Design a protein with these regions (language model features):
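Inter-Walker segment of RecA-like/P-loop motor cores
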Residues: 138-177
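ATP-dependent helicase/translocase motor core
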Residues: 1-121, 125, 129-141, 165-166, ...
């Protein structure tokens, strides 16, 4: 590569020799980022196509969303059934939920389980925003109209409500509890 770019003299440079060592931060970062498992995970779960009014957009997982998803995986692998991921305003909660519907559907399908997903909000404007965002990302969104509908949905344990085989999520306002 150095010869192709007409800079073979760099090979004898002390910086070049230092950066070829296994313990350099750059080498560790590149190797961890492009490990087969991580790269496969990112290609399979870390890209979303969003049907935006201005045209189709490609969204990618941010690194905190990747770390959150991997933390969920670690907790599930240890047998834990609940947990909290703390997010701040504008940190990509809706995107994380979308990415995890994809990821957790595959995770549980390996165990023969069809999961049901709920996205709970505390305001009507957030409910509408979440419904719109999930729909734009290709999820089937199931709105809950009343407390009775919500109770029936949980009691019946019906995990899919569409015949197209689309991934789905139920968006509910906390006031329906």
């Amino acid at each position: 590569m150095l010869r192709d770019n007409n800079v073979p003299q760099y090979k004898n440079n002390s910086d070049y020799k230092t950066n070829c060592k296994a313990e350099t931060p750059t080498k560790r970062l590149c190797e961890s980022l492009f490990s087969f498992e991580r790269f496969y995970f990112f290609l399979r779960y870390g890209i979303a196509y969003v049907d935006h009014p201005n045209g189709l957009q490609k969204h990618v997982m941010r690194y905190p969303q990747v770390f959150a998803t991997k933390a969920i995986e670690r907790h599930l692998d240890k047998g834990e059934q609940k947990g909290i991921i703390w997010h701040t305003q504008g940190s990509g909660k809706t995107a994380l939920a979308y990415f995890n519907v994809k990821y957790l559907t595959d995770y549980y399908s390996q165990q023969g389980i069809v999961p049901q997903f709920f996205f709970i909000v505390d305001r009507i404007d957030l409910l509408e925003q979440a419904q719109k965002e999930f729909t734009r990302r290709g999820l089937k969104v199931n709105p809950v109209q009343s407390k009775e509908d919500f109770a029936k949905l949980i009691k019946d344990g019906v995990t899919t409500q569409n015949k197209e085989g689309k991934l789905e999520i139920t968006v509910v306002n906390i006031h329906k509890f």
